[in-house]
Amino acid sequence: MKAVTYAISSLIMAASLPSLAQSPSPQTSPSPQATEALPPGPNPNSQYRLGPDSLPQAGVPKGEIRGPYTLPCQAYPGTQHTYWVYVPAQYDPAVATALMIYQDGQAFKDENGDLRAQNVMDNLIYRREIPVMIGIFINPGRRPDQPEPSPTNWGDDTTNRRIEYNSLDDKYARVITEELMPLLYKEYNISKDPEMHGIGGSSSGAIAAFTVAWERPNDFRKVLSNVGSFVDLRGGYVYPERVLASDRKPIRVFLCDGRNDHRGTLRGPYDEKMDWFLQNVRLLKALTQKGYDVNYTWGVNLHGQKFGGAIMPDMMRWLWRDGPVSTEPNDMVERGFRQPVTKKD
């Protein structure tokens, strides 16, 4: 039985999809200093707080974060990616496990940040609300002489992030599937089933995650998108038309955005191709019209992780809702919390 969702996608299936020109502009990210008008009243982010599922809980086994590791990049010669590996306490090398990859890994694993994905996985795995899974926190590529991204500087101006994440080709998908995944398969017992592979991100990391699944649906089937930059940074606003013009792909998508995300005036006069909220809604309508397994939540949040972090546990539950389950009444293992695997000498 499917989980209760935030909104019923079928309600918007008949909605019209505004048509936009199909020639993307190879532009760069807007200036982080740019400001836009906000509605009167409290800060739009003021109501969003992390809940207990995003915080360490007494008695819940904590996974281990290993790394950092360095991945030399072939798709973008001269660059390298730093990544960390989350290994849950319940990981058993004898049992194939699920996989979740987070772009802008430094932000998703930040213990004082707005996302704290490792806590979410600890809590939900323990309560059997998502499968046991390996988590990967991967940063955008950079040259060795460039600084590592940090929670306060995600690297738009100092790394390869803008190009890797916002481009609509398959080069970043190659980084993940052809360069990173073979290393993970060697080290961990990760399922080869694409239904057991998820990928997510925030802002440009969200469109990057969508592009990986779009280009490689036989490798990734679940996409978590927070304030996705489906705008004209490097042509991302064309995705709704691409979705409608293509055969439906076997991917599941959760879109999260806010009414006070960047609203099209970062570069001056209003430009609908640079309206984050509009473009997320357009993508939702296209995915719904084509029959995708898609869910969404629209808040009043600004661009950032406040709202996405607050509902990340629910996004993860929905994306991973259909894992195997035992209904045997005497299965006391299934009826109990997932316990850590005893490590063998």
Name each model-derived stretch.
Residues 8-9, 19, 54:
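Cleavable N-terminal signal peptides
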Residues 22-345:
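Non-catalytic cap/lid and distal C-terminal segments of serine-dependent acyl enzymes
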Residues 1-10:
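Bacterial N-terminal signal peptides that target proteins for export
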